[in-house]
Amino acid sequence: GLTAETDSEKEQRLSEYAEVLLRQSKKLKKLLDDLLEASKATTGNLEVHPEVCDVSVLLSQAAGEYEQRFSDKKLETIVKQPEETVKVMADGRHLWRVFDNLLNNIYKYAQAGSRVYLNVEHDGQDVRIIFRNMSAFPLEMSPEELEERFTRGDKSRHMEGNGLGLSIAKSLTELQNGDMQIVTDGDLFKV
């Protein structure tokens, strides 16, 4: 027959439900925050406070934030930067968010055990910051499709995320008079 649930079993079950609700509400809040930021960035309704930013320092700090996660996934990070300081006029918060979104994308979709290349190039006039990695999934979509909001490759549907990261990164880059291009070649992903 049926056995009655003890008080401790009921408490355990309720505690598990509460944890699930909390996790789901955090995901929903992140989605709403990302949507709001994407909307503001796309429409130009996001404040931009340009200042002189040291790209090398900012990129190194952002890469440092991902060091443990990359290590857990056996990703080897190779950073190549000019010896001289590379400075740009940008909003440091927005540039940080661009780096964070791109590194988070790499963490989620890079082939475990592969290399991640972060390059800063400066030709005297333009500064290029290049993120390159091998994808764990076939890159069957065009770069334009990958930049669209809510777009995620079919093979990555089971991964955490809402498909806004690249779209936000592109909008924030353009908002600061920059340009972001995605290049795919087989399983090579380059921004």
Question: Where are each of the predicted segments found?
Answer:
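A conserved beta-strand-to-alpha-helix junction within the catalytic ATP-binding
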Residues: 49-67
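Conserved micro-motifs of the catalytic ATP-binding
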Residues: 43-48, 87-90
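Short alpha-helical segment of the dimerization/phosphotransfer core of two-component systems
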Residues: 20-28
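Short helix-loop "hinge" at the ATP-lid/N-box region of the Bergerat-fold HATPase_c
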Residues: 106-107
